[in-house]
Amino acid sequence: MTDVAPSGALPQPSAEPPPLIGRVVATERLPSTPHAFHFWTRLDAPIGIGTIVRVASPIPVAGALPQVCGVVTEGQGYSDLQSPLHDVLAQDGNPDAARAATERTEIRLYTAQVLRQLPEEPLQPVPLGPVYLATEQDVAVALRMDGYLAPGRRTAIPVGVYRAGGLQVPVHLDADFLVGPEAAHLAISGVSGLATKTSAILFLLQSLFAHFPASRGRVAAVCFNVKGPDLCFLDQPGALEEGDRALYDQLGVPAAPFPAVHYFAPYTARGVTLNTLRTHPDLAHNVTPLTWGLPEVLQYAEVLLSKEDLDAKADALIDFIRERVVGRRFEDAGLSRPHEVQSFADLEAWFRDVLRTLEEGGREQWRTHHAATLRKVRNRLGNLSTRCAGLVTDDGALSDLPFGAFEDRAVYVVDVARVEEDAQDLVFARVVSRLREHLERRDLGVDHVVVFVDELNKYAPADGPDTYVRKMLLDIAERGRYLGLVLFGAQQFRSQVHRRVVGNAGTSVFGRMDGEELATPGYQGLSPAVKARLATLDKGQLLVRHPHFAQPVFVRFPRPAVMAGREGVERFPPPPEPTWQQAVARDLRRLDPSIELGWVTEVSALHDEAEALSARNAVLRQRPDDVRAAFLRALARRARPAAVDAEGVAPRP
């Protein structure tokens, strides 16, 4: 056995010899090969599926004694009986009868897949020899962790511990193969509720933040919360048992919640409160509205419009609007006035002016664009702010993630669990695209970003149409590691995710699996015994496949040191929806504690709800020193210009 070494350090051998547990056997029917071998053990040997063992050959090869490490993948037990009938006759057909005069010999025979051979050349069949239970140093060598645990390298990221025969050894992933540049991405699969997929990702992020070498740059995480309150309380401490705390200590990871977490969520359709379960007043300090206007949405119109909507003519008109109309002053001799299109309301006024020009002139085309195409695109684009109400604003207001100012070791949670599917797709597409753009320019604020997406089969399904989001995920999976854009994806059924997405994941993790899923072709490399263990894994247990591991290995990880979603909702219940006056006063009070409900009610008495909420949003984005004056100015700007008629078109002179 060896003394336990702290995570990130090479284990040191002790003088105590490892326990001898069996011997390699090879027959014509069960021969040893360079990649597999068989061995028998005592009946009481602490061996099971997933145990790592070492074979020591007494015969030198190329001047060195071969050492072979393997992991048990199958087990058998049998006796010298030729037929079950013989045992029945020996007991006179009665299981309770006196025992036979001679106790039958029973054997335990195991099959192991080779993890590593030393020396690695020449590669030969596993020799006959004694089999030992692996020590801590043996585990590090078998999984090739000695290379990235060595002094001067130290790119090891703890993922959990390997347990067998009373031994508990930290298992590490190589950061160069987890977040790049050698390989990247992680895919975790397992049945819902039992596989602890989200918990495993959260612990791995904590481990990554604690152990990622400073020499490799700055790292942050962007997590999309797509269901329930799973990720809503990452900055709150969770209850940990002593066993979990001991694992944190051994793995060198702080048993504490994430120190820097920033939340972003769109408003509800009404716009009074944020559409998230994290609305308790005690948690509002780090929650920022997520709202986009016309310029931000138009760039990703393909996400929200179907292929029937985006024919060649409509696509050409949208490109014209994006490049020539939005964000600049547009003048045309036939229009009633110059247009400065900054919002959906401005775009609607522009469309009405163009169509009125065609009707008054009796024409069917405007600048090569047919009137039918104009009406079609107008209807489709004008509907976006309604379909994504709360996220997409009519007034062009922008409140976004801090692209260009990301913090090292910070977590940015985008909560879209309560918004419609179209809005979820838009948020995912735009946020990830913006991350890529900034990483390409090297001005995001960090060098690596881990993007965590649950329900990956929804965004990159194995079957179905080739959507904008799926194409984007494929591109990230195949080229993201060169940019520092890393995908951590979770899904219940790995077989339902596009094979190029999971195939490009350098690390694959499996929690408790469904039997039908294990029967799919993607798991044919696993032995029946490993599949059987996968189908019965407890919470906190995982099977990890990594580029350095010749075979996947079972590990156990501690529960995350953050508050679970269900517990968080009980402790910080969302308050009832307030009136719009109460909502404005509450939000402005975050910037100026002296603001009272009576003052807000008084100054907004001549304004409707939409104008007051829009003014509030503007103040929250600006964060001015004089909140009262800024709110009054914003209210005044919300008044509709008198020179524009009800249809948004100025009267002709």
What are these regions (language model features)?
Residues 2-151:
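Conserved ASCE P-loop ATPase motor domains encompassing nucleic-acid-directed helicases/translocases
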